[in-house]
Swiss-Prot record:
This is Chaperone protein DnaJ 1. InterPro entries: DnaJ (IPR012724), DnaJ_C (IPR002939), DnaJ_domain (IPR001623), DnaJ_domain_CS (IPR018253), HSP40/DnaJ_pept-bd (IPR008971), HSP_DnaJ_Cys-rich_dom (IPR001305), HSP_DnaJ_Cys-rich_dom_sf (IPR036410), J_dom_sf (IPR036869). PANTHER family: CHAPERONE PROTEIN DNAJ 1, DNAJ HOMOLOG 1, MITOCHONDRIAL-RELATED. GO terms for biological process: chaperone cofactor-dependent protein refolding; chaperone-mediated protein folding; DNA replication; protein refolding; regulation of gene expression; response to heat. The keyword Chaperone applies. The gene is dnaJ1. PROSITE patterns: DNAJ_1 (PS00636), DNAJ_2 (PS50076), ZF_CR (PS51188). Gene3D superfamilies: DnaJ domain, Heat shock protein DnaJ, cysteine-rich domain, Urease metallochaperone UreE, N-terminal domain. Transmembrane segments: none annotated. Belongs to the DnaJ family. Keywords: Chaperone, Cytoplasm, DNA replication, Metal-binding, Repeat, Stress response, Zinc, Zinc-finger. Participates actively in the response to hyperosmotic and heat shock by preventing the aggregation of stress-denatured proteins and by disaggregating proteins, also in an autonomous, DnaK-independent fashion. Unfolded proteins bind initially to DnaJ; upon interaction with the DnaJ-bound protein, DnaK hydrolyzes its bound ATP, resulting in the formation of a stable complex. GrpE releases ADP from DnaK; ATP binding to DnaK triggers the release of the substrate protein, thus completing the reaction cycle.
């Protein structure tokens, strides 16, 4: 979204939060509204679609610290009549007539103000006024307006997140018009260079001792004119539609991680570059596996004899099973490490598999098993083994 539109919109009100809301409050408000207003949940309701777009625009600005700071500064600058309504008082008596076109007293439009800033490459008000008062009076061609960034969410199984997965992602957003391929012109025609400004998008004017540039009124600052607009997009080059894109989720993605898909965001007007799409990944917990960074964790139930006498366990991994040797006399709760069988790393290779052994006590014993265990207990006592020897809880 261009800066010029920020003056006219209250993004905080759009999301229903205060101007000092925390990032988490903004995120929660956006998620709730996006869920309620999503076109898939409101088929045949264009009003909900427009509201969904407005909420997405507000979140796009307020969720980015740099954009939010710039937005707040812009609102403060123009709040309370600082530049007053639709007319700009030059402070030079009536000499400028409100910066009118040709000195006829026409009102100054704030949209023109920001268009001028965009064309001169400036991002500050100081740069803007420097251009208006003749500091660097050459007009530059207007830059195409990049589309907004978009955000969406998806949910993955634990194994899908660990190994990576290719998946279709369905979203509803402004996209290049399929009828005119984003040009805005009716198929078979093309935009023409504006003859008034020769494609620069601005007109240079001199008024007394001052020179300044203003947007070309014929092409509205775009530098081109569409004589025959596309019937589908009405000349914007953009239509809101539902599309499906194939997304490759890289191996090792973590819960809450954002993935950037360049150029998959909202389409720019008249063939301008598209914004980016940010996908927040949510990972469902797994019944078997856990994760510690790039290490894969698993807890395996074992018997007392497997720990006391030693054994080999068949342990699940992301790719089949692996045999893990349990040394004789292994303690309950010990972690056994299997190198290279964990979660794939972005830099190559994989983390380790961490196997925790946990004794499973039989709830009931009878017959030969009970007799054998009782005989073992007697032999253990006679050997002098005391599991609580040296325990701090002894009194």
């Amino acid at each position: 979204m261009a800066q010029r539109e920020w003056v006219e919109k209250d993004f905080y009100q759009e999301l229903g939060v205060s101007s000092d809301a925390s990032p988490e409050e903004i995120k929660r408000a956006y998620r709730k509204l996006a869920r309620d207003l999503h076109p898939d949940a409101n088929p045949g309701n264009p009003a909900a679609g427009e509201r969904f777009k407005a909420v997405s625009e507000a979140h796009n600005v307020l969720s980015d610290p740099a954009k939010r700071k710039e937005y707040d500064e812009t609102r403060r600058l123009f709040a309370g009549g600082g530049f007053g309504g639709r007319r700009f008082d030059s402070g030079f008596g009536g000499g400028f007539g409100g910066f009118g076109v040709g000195g006829d007293g026409a009102e100054f439009n704030l949209n023109d103000l920001f268009d001028a800033a965009s064309r001169t490459g400036g991002t500050t008000i100081g740069d803007l006024f420097g251009g208006l008062f003749g500091r660097g009076g050459s007009a530059r061609p207007s830059r195409p307006r990049r589309g907004n960034d978009l955000e969406t969410e998806t949910e993955l199984d634990f194994v899908e997140a660990a190994k990576g997965v290719a998946m279709p992602l369905r979203l509803t957003s402004p996209a290049p018009c399929t009828n005119c391929h984003g040009s805005g012109a009716r198929p078979g025609t093309s935009p023409k260079v504006c003859p008034t400004c020769n494609g620069s998008g601005v007109i240079n004017r001199n008024q007394g001792a001052f020179g300044f540039s203003e947007p070309c009124t014929d092409c509205r600052g775009s530098g081109s004119i569409i004589e025959h607009p596309c019937e589908e997009c009405k000349g914007t080059g953009v239509t809101t539609r539902t599309r499906t894109i194939n997304v490759r989720i890289p191996p090792g993605v973590e819960d809450g991680q954002r993935i950037r898909l360049a150029g998959q965001g909202e389409a720019g007007l008249r063939g301008a570059p598209s914004g980016d799409l940010y996908v927040t990944v949510h990972v469902r917990p797994d019944k078997i596996f856990g994760r510690d960074g790039d290490d894969l964790t698993v807890t395996v139930p074992v018997s007392f004899t497997e720990l006391a006498l030693g054994s080999t366990l068949s342990v699940p991994t992301l790719d089949g099973t692996v045999g893990v040797r349990v040394p004789k006399g292994t303690a309950d709760g010990r972690i056994l490490r299997v190198r290279g069988r964990g979660v794939p790393k972005r830099s190559g290779g994989s983390g380790d598999l961490l196997v925790t052994v946990k004794v499973a006590v039989p709830p009931n014993l009878a017959g030969a098993a009970q007799e054998a265990l009782e005989a073992y207990a007697a032999a253990e006592r006679s050997s002098g083994f005391n599991p609580r020897a040296g325990w701090a809880g002894n009194r």
